Amino acid sequence: MNISYVDWLRERVGSRKVFLPFATVVLRDSQDRILLQQRTDFDFWGMPGGVLELDEDWETCARRELSEETGLEVGSLRLVGVYTDPRYDVTYPNGDQVQQFTICFEGAVCGGEMKPDGVESRDQLFLPAEELASYPIPRWYRDMIADALQGGSPSFRSPFALAQTRDQISSVRPFVGPARFSAVGAAFIITREDGHILMLKQAAEGAWRPPAGFCQLGENVAHTAVRVARQETGLRIDPQRILGVYA
């Protein structure tokens, strides 16, 4: 693909709301300050990151976007959390509508020279955590920063869905034909009290797999797990923790 995934997709679907997979980094310097960047397309401040390309994994995307937008390199990355809530939805100045499926990492600067790219970032600065409140930072970035500062297990929001949801596959497939596109979803491990793991046998292939399904526009990924578990198994589940992120 000679153009970026998001440009390719928008050429086909227009400005309609779609899921976009993002990777973002909460970057710290040697003084434990957090990097903020002022975007060129909005007036707010946020953190470096961008859209996952086809055939790219989450960590590679996070490192690439960080380097492209800031000129900086990051060492080892820790998973902060998964941010997919429809209350984080964005409409860009050009009218493009997005439901985020954002994987957030945190790490420390290990090299490079800080320089805004002038394309997505017009200014950058490292700030102590206590000074962040005075900057216009969207809710989703504030949640990521708060989760990074808290530490602990990777974060996710409780199951939530809007009153009306929409199938993401049928929202995109008619416009792209048989071409590959990024469809987001969840696979989950359901265990009994005795530690046994639930597996499902696929009717067509006969292979065994854990319950899994695509997210719907208008729900977060925890709600996807609850909904798909009910549909595929009849069970009600309570999502407990993130095991990993895979692309």
What is each residue range found by the language model?
Residues 52-78, 83-140, 215-238, 247:
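Unchanged
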Residues 26, 36, 104-106, 126, ...:
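Conserved hydrophobic/aromatic beta-strand scaffold that supports enzyme active sites
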Residues 34, 114, 196-197:
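Hydrophobic "anchor" residues
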